[in-house]
């Protein structure tokens, strides 16, 4: 029995509210159960220096958590003077994941920055950030297309992410914190809307896992991604 009472293959409730910020070119608030992440997309009219005169654009991401996103207060990283290794790892993952769904030549020499701010954390914040970040990116690109700034759509497919793991000896979909903190195996799966894999991160936290178990987790992830892509489409109308 999962702590939440969910079935092994049951996602948490998912909602994506678009256009929640006035100034950002694209934004949304994604809720996956009790994990809530505010995602925004900002368009910058020049690429990073290493892409100057290449004709290619760039998508990057920044990630952070509010001090009371968790059960006890975490000190702001700005106050500490540096980002944690975890934060740097997560924002690089978000950027890599979203770039995989973009034709950077069609984007032109500009950069889109995705900001993911965790308002409340209950497991799966990086996955929620990728799924919501894609919606913010899609909305920002729509504005470029509508304004005639770019002529071809650079977004080639949906991108979404979900966690899966082995909890109490059973493969489960979409781990919350109670499960994630005690799972024997933990994994994050980033897929396209056509179930093509972008990134798979799996690790044995308490016990090693078999190839068959990995396949079971991938099957769960594909089903979960299909639900998340449906939520993305519903948010965009």
Curated annotation (Swiss-Prot):
One of its GO terms (biological process) is rRNA catabolic process. InterPro entries: ExoRNase_PH_dom1, ExoRNase_PH_dom2, ExoRNase_PH_dom2_sf, PNPase/RNase_PH_dom_sf, Ribosomal_Su5_D2-typ_SF, RNase_PH, RNase_PH_bac-type, RNase_PH_CS. It catalyses: tRNA(n+1) + phosphate = tRNA(n) + a ribonucleoside 5'-diphosphate. The keyword Phosphoprotein does not apply. Keywords: Nucleotidyltransferase, RNA-binding, rRNA processing, Transferase, tRNA processing, tRNA-binding. GO terms for molecular function: 3'-5'-RNA exonuclease activity; tRNA binding; tRNA nucleotidyltransferase activity. SUPFAM superfamilies: Ribonuclease PH domain 2-like, Ribosomal protein S5 domain 2-like. Phosphorolytic 3'-5' exoribonuclease that plays an important role in tRNA 3'-end maturation. Removes nucleotide residues following the 3'-CCA terminus of tRNAs; can also add nucleotides to the ends of RNA molecules by using nucleoside diphosphates as substrates, but this may not be physiologically important. Probably plays a role in initiation of 16S rRNA degradation (leading to ribosome degradation) during starvation. Belongs to the RNase PH family. Homohexameric ring arranged as a trimer of dimers. This is Ribonuclease PH. It comes from Cereibacter sphaeroides (strain ATCC 17029 / ATH 2.4.9). The gene is rph.
């Amino acid at each position: 029995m999962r702590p939440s009472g969910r079935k092994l293959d049951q996602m948490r409730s998912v909602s994506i509210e678009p256009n929640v910020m006035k100034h950002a070119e694209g934004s949304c608030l994604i809720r996956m159960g009790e994990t809530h992440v505010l995602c925004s997309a900002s368009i910058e009219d020049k690429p990073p220096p290493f892409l100057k005169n290449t004709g290619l654009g760039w998508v990057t991401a920044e990630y952070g958590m509010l001090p009371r996103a968790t059960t006890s207060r975490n000190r702001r990283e700005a106050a500490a003077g540096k980002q944690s290794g975890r934060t740097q790892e997560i924002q690089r993952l978000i950027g890599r994941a979203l770039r995989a769904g973009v034709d950077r030549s069609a984007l032109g020499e500009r950069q889109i920055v995705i900001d993911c701010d965790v308002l409340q954390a209950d497991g799966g914040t990086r996955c929620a950030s990728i799924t919501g970040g894609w919606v913010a990116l899609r909305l920002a690109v729509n504005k470029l297309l509508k304004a005639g700034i770019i002529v071809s759509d650079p977004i080639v497919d949906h991108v979404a992410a979900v966690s899966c793991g082995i909890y109490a000896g059973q493969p489960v979909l979409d781990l919350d914190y109670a499960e994630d903190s005690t799972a024997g195996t933990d994994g994050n799966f980033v897929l396209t809307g056509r179930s093509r894999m972008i990134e798979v991160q799996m690790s044995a936290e308490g016990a090693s896992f078999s190839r068959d178990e990995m396949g079971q987790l991938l099957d769960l992830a594909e089903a979960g991604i299909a639900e998340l892509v449906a939520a993305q489409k519903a948010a965009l109308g």
